[in-house]
From Swiss-Prot:
Keywords: Hydrolase, NAD. It catalyses: NAD(+) = 3'cADPR + nicotinamide + H(+). This is Probable 3' cyclic ADP-D-ribose synthase ThsB'. The lineage of its organism: Bacteria, Bacillati, Bacillota, Bacilli, Bacillales. GO terms for molecular function: hydrolase activity. Homodimer. InterPro entries: Toll_tir_struct_dom_sf (IPR035897). It comes from Bacillus cereus (strain MSX-D12). Gene3D superfamilies: Toll/interleukin-1 receptor homology (TIR) domain.
């Protein structure tokens, strides 16, 4: 198993953009996001609320595509709720995000070099942990050689996300680690109390 790397996520993002080869890269990305926005259903239950820094938008698009390719549904605020103003903290935005988190089974906290610049990530983590306790840290690293991760400060309290194949199979899966040697498939973790 390995952790997620920036290059893997950017390549995955590029692959989805490349499918719209007759558009420029920016136009293709915009078309993909607009299609996702049109398909948004406020009554839908998502497997994952993806908490992240907007500065990582391209990587997050790649991560969303990867996870959805495994059969899970992912809520990303700037895709599903383009009207939200993320540049400042407001009661209106907080209210909408609370509703969306209520519609999600878990929260993945995508930590990167840009996470410190997010106004919303710490609040999303605390709120979701308080209502559902299904929170996992998803490290986005420059490089990854294994599946070990030690979160700093309060992030070390939560399990973390890695990717890998199922034993005796080529099928990819998301794994939730409580330590490097203790882990469970994401779908099984969702069903645990």
């Amino acid at each position: 198993m390995t952790l997620f790397t920036e290059n893997d996520l950017l390549n995955n993002s590029y692959k989805s953009i490349q499918k719209s080869y007759h558009f420029s890269e920016n136009q293709a990305a915009k078309n993909i996001l607009e299609q996702a926005y049109k398909n948004y259903d406020k009554n839908k239950i998502y497997d994952i609320f993806l908490s992240h820094s907007f500065l990582d938008a391209r990587k997050i698009l790649g991560l969303k595509n990867y996870i959805e390719g495994l059969g899970y549904s992912v809520y990303v605020d700037w895709i599903e709720d383009k009207q939200l103003d993320r540049s400042k903290v407001s009661k209106e935005t907080a209210g909408i995000l609370r509703e969306r988190m209520q519609s999600c089974k878990s929260l993945f906290f995508a930590i990167s070099e840009n996470s410190d610049h997010s106004l919303w990530m710490p609040w999303e983590l605390g709120y979701f942990d308080g209502i559902k306790q299904k929170v996992a840290i998803l490290p986005v690293l420059k490089s990854s050689y294994d599946d070990s991760y030690n979160g700093q400060e309060y992030l070390g309290l939560y399990p973390y996300v890695a990717k890998g194949t199922i034993i005796n199979s080529t099928q990819e899966e998301i794994w939730i680690h409580s330590s490097q040697k203790q882990y469970v498939r994401f779908r099984n973790w969702l069903q645990q109390n």
